[in-house]
Each structure stands twice: as structure tokens, then as C-alpha cells.
Amino acid sequence: MVGEDPYLISDLDRRGRRRSFAERYDPSLKTMIPMRPYARLAPNPVDDAGLLSFATFSWLTPVMIRSYKHTLTVDTLPPLSPYDSSDVNAKRLQILWDEEIERVGPERASLGRVVWKFQRTRVLMDVVANILCIIMAALGPTVLIHQILQHVTNISSGHIGISICLCLALFATEFTKVLFRALAWAINYRTAIRLKVALSTLIFKNLLSFKTLTHISAGEVLNVLSSDSYSLFEAALFCPLPATIPILMVVCAVYAFFILGSTALVGICVYLIFIPIQMFMAKLNSAFRRSAISVTDKRVQTMNEFLTCIKLIKMYAWEKSFMNTIHDIRKREKKLLEKAGYVQSGNSALAPIVSTIAIVSTFTCHIFLKRTLTAPVAFSVIAMFNVMKFSIAILPFSVKAVAEASVSLRRMKKILVAKSPPSYITQPEDPDTILLLANATLTWEQEINRKRGPSKTQDQRRHVFKKQRAELYSEQSLSDQGVASPERQSGSPKSVLHNISFVVRKGKVLGICGNVGSGKSSLISALLGQMQLQKGVVAASGPLAYVSQQAWIFHGNVRENILFGEKYNHQRYQHTVHVCGLQKDLNSLPYGDLTEIGERGVNLSGGQRQRISLARAVYANRQLYLLDDPLSAVDAHVGKHVFEECIKKTLKGKTVVLVTHQLQFLESCDEVILLEDGEICEKGTHKELMEERGRYAKLIHNLRGLQFKDPEHIYNVAMVETLKESQAQRDEDAVLASGDERDEGKEPETEEFVDIKAPVHQLIQIESPQEGIVTWKTYHTYIKASGGYLVSFLVLCLFFLMMGSSAFSTWWLGLWLDSGSQVICAPQSNETACNVNQTLQDTKHHMYQLVYIASMMSVLTFGIIKGFTFTNTTLMASSSLHNRVFNKIVSSPMSFFDTTPTGRLMNRFSKDMDELDVRLPFHAENFLQQFSMVVFILVIMAASFPVVLVVLAGLAILFFILLRIFHRGVQELKQVENISRSPWFSHITSSMQGLGVIHAYDKKDDCISKFKALNDENSSHLLYFNCALRWFALRMDILMNIVTFVVALLVTLSFSSISASSKGLSLSYIIQLSGLLQVCVRTGTETQAKFTSAELMREYISTCVPEHTQSFKVGTCPKDWPSRGEITFKDYRMRYRDNTPLVLDGLNLNIQSGQTVGIVGRTGSGKSSLGMALFRLVEPASGTIFIDEVDICTVGLEELRTKLTMIPQDPVLFVGTVRYNLDPLGSHTDEMLWHVLERTFMRDTIMKLPEKLQAEVTENGENFSVGERQLLCMARALLRNSKIILLDEATASMDSKTDTLVQSTIKEAFKSCTVLTIAHRLNTVLNCDLVLVMENGKVIEFDKPEVLAEKPDSAFAMLLAAEVGL
């Protein structure tokens, strides 16, 4: 049953020709061969399996034996079969989905219908196998047991041979049943895995088709691709099973009516009544799950945001606020999960309850009508109802699967019908033109009413293009462009860019500048096709490269981030590294360019991240370069080097669009655009704009005046000229040196780093298969979390009471029949009949009837109580584990987050929490019900027919050998599946964060290919795990079939001293046990596998080492500390993690109260590490920091961090409102908030928003520009009113004007504070009292800026000269 041949999938696109039957099912037909002696050595052994091997899972035996002898790893398991792969199945599902959309439209399209078409052939084959299984299952209990029990009553020797033949027939039917059931599951598992990989790939491809994600959150994406795809996997497994129930009902009803009479219909009716009840409960469960999932999405999204922004949260000591938020969401989620759990638990309890009610009702009615009842008839009916019970027992699985699948399909359809808007970017007609915008008005939102069709819109664009081309290519002044605001129709969204018109010819450099929020980044986004075009034309030619304002770095090494899928060329690569100023950085890294980078580049500085992003663009060697402020995060010297060597030289001949706040670079641009409020304010060459003396000229004069004409300092013209001359001399020396090298035939890049072999896992700690093995500590932790041992014991007792009541009712019936036979029994034509009429007349036997009915009521009562208590207990456990793990992670140091991928943590809080909340309780409940039933069956059989225990003991050795192999193998397979899931999660998260970059470089296919590879790897291990469960189940079934055969022989050949009811009871129970025991062991193993999630959570609880939240030493801290803000470093050394180099080495410096200190130095010199040290995000290796003469290591972390304020390099905004982002703790009034917004020049911007302070902030603050985000962060800092302020390049994303205003605000607002300013633009530190110059983690200069500037050979003077030289 292999399915579609991957090499024939392409034929599916040929809609005109249907493939022949042989073409479509060739691999499946080969599998139908009973045995295939000549193996083709396929990548996966299942593809070489014949029918017998496929049905019995024998192809898996080598893997199970290997798992027993050796530890399994991701690399040692065979890959997923090509027929089950993402690539093959996603293509096929995509075609079916496209056909559905084309046929009925997106609104009426049914994803469920498409899923049915995708797998209907395999489902029908599965149903056929299940029907054959059901026929065999019904044949044994209904016909053969009845015949055996009838022959048992006849002691004549002539019947012994017939009895033995009946026993052999019973063994044959049971064995055939087992074989067909195994075949059905073998088909089902491959069907389910194909559906899972196909749907998840289709979802990911659709999400990746968007250039920006605004319609779905990151949390929802993770939930859909993990939990929802698994829900569809389970649905494909269990949904076909109920199709056999009607056939079973008919067979059992007919035969029961035949042997018992019309009263048998009572029991059948009971089953039929409960089926619609289960359907109603399924709908109810679906509604509760739908509500719970929406809250789960919110929790996962908030958790993802928390983990992404953990550094800022720790610095601001906001952990408690976020913990309260997530705990509140979790409480809401738990309430909804409780309701779904009650319904689900009721569904699980229905099988034993319905069976007991049906049997008791049938026999009570039969006896009440004074009809004759014999032991063979009674126990044949019981055996038959037990077969029906197993069929009903699968309904909870199917009902749960349908309920969750319906929710999942609805969520998936919502994603699939959301189509990315058509590209509005056209090709310029002039081959010399690379970029052209003609009266382009763009918005971030889609228009509400699109009255024009696509063709009409395209025609209009062409018309506008032709009409305005002559005007654009002329030398006319464009001063009138972009002034008038476009008229918009009612219902159209607000435009962000208005009437933008400009042309960029091939090989030209266009500089774009403007204030914060003027639309610079939006213009880059417009050129990338990420916005919505309302009118006008946007045309671009040639492949492009894009450097985003906030660098996107993925988990891998430096080289992988630079190459980004391109082939490695040594010379080109070395040149790229040189021109991007990365040589020294790579030489300082432990493994050079093979050094592993954490997620989002956590172990790199902002400047290093930005230059790696730039190197990626340079190495790509594209025709068009869109650079969104790439030089703000680097110091002046590196900035000059990058601009000169990279942008002016390496990219010479390329077309470059450079957005920058560093106006000194604009002089070298061929053309400059000044944006204001989304419109072009001025446009022309630098010289032309300076001559016009407009806004641009004023900005440039302000910049120069700010840098060199400040009356407070001594920077005069002579000094500037001196600095220029010294810099020019250094540049000339460098040129001469490089010339000498060229004369000698050497490469100009002399500092070429050497390739070295790096270990695979340097930073990110990998999950090993040994981690997560379930130990007793896990069960202990779970039991304590659920309320303790007493609560767990009481819950366990409820299971035994419920199932004990069910088993008791059957035993009591046998006792009743024995009692009746003692009163009056007579042989009647080869059977013993009891005259129940006379039995009922005896008052003693009224008690039997009452107790029999009471047993039914007790099953019902205990079932209801069990459902409520078990649901509450398991949810208490999962919530307790969630909160404990979250609290542990929150209190972990930053080194933990540096070495633990966010994807792995999100795996814990999404998929693993789903396992603990929903799947573990479901499997555990079924296991406990089955286990308690097995115990009572064994007890009753031991009492009524002890010889059975001898048979079971004889096969116990084989059973334990099988269990030992199975248990080891299934545990390891589950571990490997868990481990392979984390990289998959990380790739999803990283891809969603880097959509813009992925599209710009046209790497969507590479990203999808990697997703498919990771998806296939995880799905392969999931398939192996599930197949291992069935491998064991089949072999257990065969062992129990042997036991059933032996017991049937013993019943046939046993002494007459054993009553007929005892024999009937034993035979009906051994048939029940033969199926129940393997189900019990398998469900127990699945439950233990689900406990792996609890083990992984426990590991975090036990291994996460908290930060030193309390002080190291005993010390007293004044109440108003710090009152002055004096900071002293004494021989301070710091490293980020053990066995890593020092990042701060022997710092000794004193900063007086109220001083402003500018911290400068090359990228990676240790500037940002100073902030980490002050906030104790990293504990010192040695040395001390004193604030107001108090050792900060003697102060609690929360107290320390609340007294300091940090404005980070990368602005961080949270999903919520503007007010929440400014004041998460809600401790300030609106007036105070408006006041700080006014001081940071954001009041007008917020006032324009409809809901003002309550205005929505989207994920990552995407509805604000980077500069606006930074200003909001500045406002947030002003509210804290701290004595010590650290600005980590806080104004890097601001234009010079806003920067100047903000600097004056900082000077005024923090005039009594100690302010440390880390900056790359030196104008931000020239007014500081002191300048601290750092290099390689050491202080190389610390003095007044004017003193350092007067020394031409000082490091600060060199940096200043580099900026002046620009």
C-alpha cells in the first residue's frame, strides 16, 4: 500500500490525460506480492516489504533489535520513504486544493473534502481490511464460543473431536482477525503521515508566499504546524474505524436475536442510543476545543514574545508583569480545557458503561419476561457484547479526532484561502532604468473595496507609465511632485507614501534621508513589493539584494549566514569579508567564520550582525541593492571603511538605494531624496540641494555645526583640518602599502583569516537521546504536581471501582446462574437449562436481581465521579508543571537563553504542553481503565478457572522478552522524534521572522526545501514510533491467541466438576483479554511516551540554575540607594559563559555622580558588555562594581535593575497598546505618559492614532517605524526616573535632527543623573563630560573629549578624523 510513485507525480499536472491504473498503483501492487525475496535496497525498508512483511511490520524488526542493542539517533534511522515525503504529497494535495478552489471558490471550498479526495483510496482499503477484521472478530464470540460451550455440556466422547476442531477454528478466526487489524493499521499509518506532511508543507508554503505576515501571529503559526497537523494525523488514523460499526451492529443483532430472542434487541438499542450521545459530545468537545485553542494561540504568542525580548524584560525587571500576564492567560485556557476534558473523559468512560448497561438491561429484561437462560447462551451474548464494546471503545478516539480535526481544518483553511496580494512591481521599459516610481501612492493595508479587476488595474498602470515616462526622464524640476495628497475613495485605507516619483538609472547611487517616521523604510518595503499600491507605477529591474534595518540572522555559522545558499568562492568570499570590515571580528571569534551563531545572532554585537547582513548582500552579487540604514550600528571608522570599500568601490556599477541617517554619506550619492510625512520634499544631487538652501541644506549645516561649531568645546576649523590631514596621510600610506602588495603579486587583503575545522555544536546545546528518558522522578514530579500521592491514589481507586463494578456484574451473573442451577436445573437436549421462573419465586434470588442492577448504577456513578476528578487532577498537574518551568526559565541567566534555541523552548510550551493538557490525560485514562479491567479479569478467572493462570505463566517469559525489546525501542524512537522536532520549530520561527529577506534574495524555494527536509525527518521518526507500537501489538495478539486456544482446549477437556457458568465466564473473558492485554500494554507505552513531555519539563525544573536573585554577601543597602549615581569598576573581568574568552578584561575606572560618559570603540570592543555587567545579566569572573560605594553583587537583582534604566540598541515593543508598552505595570497616570511622549517628540504621532494611548501595537511593533519604536523606548525610560541611565546606541535609527532634539531632552531630563551613552556617531558623545574608548574588552582611553581630540595619535582622535573625513 505504498501509494503514488514520486516519479509519476508530475503526470498529475497533465489535466488532459488520466494515468492508467497500473501507472497510479504500481508501487502498491508490488506491495501486494506476499513475499518479495529480491530486495531493491530502497532508502526505507518498508518500500521493499511484501504483503506479509508489510502487514506484520516485520520490516521494522531489525530496527527494534538495533534499538535494544545500541542507542538510536537521528542519523542511524532510515529516512522517510520517498512515497511518504513532503515533496510528493504536498504537490498532490496542492493540485486537489487548486481544483477545489477553481470549482467552488475560496469561500465555499472545503478542506475536508480535499483531504477525503487525497486519501480516499487508502481509506477504502483500510475499511475493507477492518470489515474483514470485524467479521472474524464477531465470528469467534458469536458462533464458535456458543458452540464450544454447548459441546462442553455433553460429556460423550464423540463430541470431543468436534470440540477440538471448534477450538482450532476459534484460533484461526482470532489469528485472521489480528492479521487484518494489523494490515488496516499499516495502511492507516502511512495514510496519516502523508496527510500530515502534505498539509504542513502546504501551510508553510502558503505562509512563505507572503512578504509580510499581518494576518496571523507567530504563536498561531507554531500551533497550526505542530498541534493542528498532529490532530489531522490522528484523524486519519481513527476516523475510518467507525465505518465498521454498522456492519458489526447488524451481525451481532441478528445472531443475538437468533440465540437469545427478542430481548437481545434491548442491549442493541442501548448501544444505538449512546452513539448519538457520543456524536453530541463530539460537537460539544469541538466547541470547547475551538475556544481553548484561541487562548492557547494567545499564550504561545505571548510566550514567544517574552522569550524573544527576554534581555530587555530582565533589564527592566518586568519578569513578574509578564509572568502574571501568562499565568492569567493560562488560567483562562485551563478553564476551557477543563470543560473539554469533562466531555472527553465522559466519552472515554462510555465504553465500559454502555457495555455494562447493555448486558444488565438485556438479562434483567430477559429474566423479567420469565424466559429460559442457559450458561452457553448467557456467556455467548456477553462475549458478543464485549466485541461490540471494543468497537464502541474506538468511538472516543474517533470522536476526539473528529472534534479536533474540524477545528484544525477550519484554522488551516483560513491560512490557505489567504492569498498573498499580486505583485504590483513591473519591468521598466527603458533598459538603462533600474528603478522607476511614477505618482506611486502606497499603503500597508489592503483596500476594502476593489472595484477594478486585475486586468483593468494593470492597464491603468501601463497608461500611467507611458503618460509620465517622458516627464520622468526629462530634466524638469520635480519640486512639485509628492506635495499634493492623493484623493482616496471611501473605504480605501490610509496611504503611507504619497505621489512618490523618481528614476534611478543603472549604476547610480540614490541616497534617501528624512526624519523618523518620514517613510524611508516604507519606501524600501515598497520597492520590495511588501506594500499595497493604491495608484501609480512601481517598476524595478534585475535581481536585488536587501539589507534590512534590523539584521536578520539565522541559526548557523557566520559563513552560512553570508553565503545564504550561494556556492562558496574563496576569493570572492575573502573580498566580501574585507570590504564589510569583518576580518578583525572573524579573527577574534573562536572558530573564525565557522563560529556558530545563536538564534537572532545573540552572541554577536549589533554592528557585527549588520555587517554580516551587508556581507550577505555583497556576496550575492546582484544588480540592485536596497540598503536600509546599514551603517548606523557601526562606529565611524568601520562605517567609513564599509562605505568607501564596499558601497563606493565594490558596488561600483551596481544600482544602490541607500537609506541613511548619517548625512555625511549623502555627498557621495549620485542623487538624494529627502522624505517628509511620506512625500518627497526635495530631490536632486547633493550639490543642487545645497545650492537650493532648502530643508536638506539646513540639515547638512546643522550636522556640521553640531559636530564642529559647538561653543562648549574647542573643535575649531584648524583642528578639523589637522584631523583631516592626519587621516588623509593614513589613507595615503594604506594606498601605497596596498600598491606595493599588488606589485609583488599579492592579494590586497593581507589579513585573510585561515579556515579551521570547527566543532559542530559550539554554542547551542543539542538535545541528546539520553535526555528525556522517563524515570521515576518524572512520575513523582507529576504526581506531586497533580495534588500529591493521596489525591492520585483516590483517583486510581475510582478507576478500579468503576471497572470493578463492571467486572463484578459479569461475575455476579455467573454466580446467579450457578445459584439458579442449584435450585432447579435439568438436562434438555445436550444443554443444561435453569428454570428461572422458580428461581425468581425464591425471595433469596430477588437479591441477585437487585445487586445486578445496582452494579450497573455503580458503574455509571463511579464513571461520572472519575471523569470530573481525573480531568481536574491532570490539568492541575499540567498547569503546575507549566508554571514551574516558566518560573524556572524566567529566573535563568542570559547564558541559558544564548545557548538554548527559542524553537526548543517554544516546543516545550506549545507541543509538549499540548501533550500534557490533552493527549497524556486521554491516553492515561484509557490505560488506567484497561489496566484495572485486566486486573479484575485475571482475578475473576483465577477464582473461577485457576488453570488459566498456569497457561499465562507459561507464556510470561516470551511476553517479557518481547516487552523488554519493545519498551527500549519505543522509548528511544519517541526521544528521537522529540529531538527532531526542535530544529523544525526553530526553522519555522526563523523563516517567519525573515520573510522580507527570504523574498528579496529569492530564497523561498531553499527555505521550503529545508522545511521539507526537517518535516520529513520528524515525520519519519513519528511513523517509526507508531509502527513500533503496532509491531508489539501484533506479536502480543499472536501470543494471546495461543493462550485463547489453550484455554478453549482446557475448557473442552476439563473435568465436569467445574460449572458451565465458570467455563463460559473463563472463555468469554479470555477472548476479551486476548485483545485487551495488548491494547493495555500498548496504551501504557503510549502513555509513558507522552510522559516524555513531562520528563522534558522536569529537566528544566531540575537543571535550570537561577540567576543570583539574592545578594551574594550580607550587606545593607540604603533605602534611597542610589542617591548619587557614582559608578566604580575595580579590576572587573567578565565572560559570557564558562570556557569562553573574557569580554571585559581588568576594567578600572571611576564615573562621578551626574557625569555623562560617552562610550566609543570598534564594533565588538565590549561597549554593550558594560551594560550587561552593570545590570548583572552576567556575573563577574572577578572584580567588583560599586554604585554609591555599594557592591552591586550584594544587592538583589530586582532591586538593582529597577534602579537602573537601559535604552537598548534594538528597540523592543510588545503586542498590546501604546500605554501597555510605556507602562506595563500600570503605575503611571495618562498625564505622565503624554508628558514623556511630548519630550520624545512622539505626542503628535500618537495623537493622530484613533485610540491614542489605547492604540494597538502589533507584533514586534511593525506598525511603527524603527525610529519611532526607539523614541517610544526613550519615553518608556523617562518614566522610570532612574539615577543611572545607559543608552546603548539608542539614537542609531534616528535622523540627525531628531537625534539632536533627543540628545537635548536627555541632557535636560537626566541632568542630575549619571548617563552612559554607547554611540557610533561621535556627535552624540562630543558634549559628554568624559569619553571612554574601549578595545578588546579593555579601557584604552578615558578622559575629556577635548583632551583626547587634541592628541592626534589617540584612538578617539582617529575615530573623529574618520568621521570628519567622510
Curated annotation (Swiss-Prot):
Composition skew (Polar residues), residue ranges: 474-493
Residues modified by glycosylation: N439, N837, N978
ABC transporter domain residues: 478-702, 1127-1361
Feature: compositional bias, Basic and acidic residues: 729-748
Transmembrane keyword on record: yes
Gene Ontology molecular function: ABC-type transporter activity; ATP binding; ATP hydrolysis activity; ATPase-coupled transmembrane transporter activity
Entries under InterPro entries matching the protein: AAA+_ATPase, ABC1_TM_dom, ABC1_TM_sf, ABC_transporter-like_ATP-bd, ABC_transporter-like_CS, ABC_transporter_C-like, P-loop_NTPase
Regions that span the bilayer: 125-145, 160-180, 235-255, 257-277, 349-369, 377-397, 788-808, 850-870, 943-963, 1038-1058
Positions that bind ATP 1: G514, N515, V516, G517, S518, G519, K520, S521
Listed SUPFAM superfamilies: ABC transporter transmembrane region, P-loop containing nucleoside triphosphate hydrolases
GO terms for biological process, alphabetical: transmembrane transport
Domain ABC transmembrane type-1: 123-404, 792-1089
Region feature Disordered, mapped onto this chain: 472-494, 729-751
Tissue-level expression: High expressed in testis.
Protein keywords: ATP-binding, Endoplasmic reticulum, Glycoprotein, Membrane, Nucleotide-binding, Repeat, Transmembrane, Transmembrane helix, Transport
Sequence positions that bind ATP 2: G1161, R1162, T1163, G1164, S1165, G1166, K1167, S1168
GO cellular component, one term: plasma membrane
Subcellular location: Endoplasmic reticulum membrane
Topology in the lipid bilayer: Multi-pass membrane protein
Pfam families, per the entry: ABC_membrane, ABC_tran
Family statement drawn from the similarity comment of this UniProt entry: Belongs to the ABC transporter superfamily. ABCC family. Conjugate transporter (TC 3.A.1.208) subfamily.
Function recorded in the entry: Probable transporter, its substrate specificity is unknown.
Protein name: ATP-binding cassette sub-family C member 12
Name of the coding gene: Abcc12
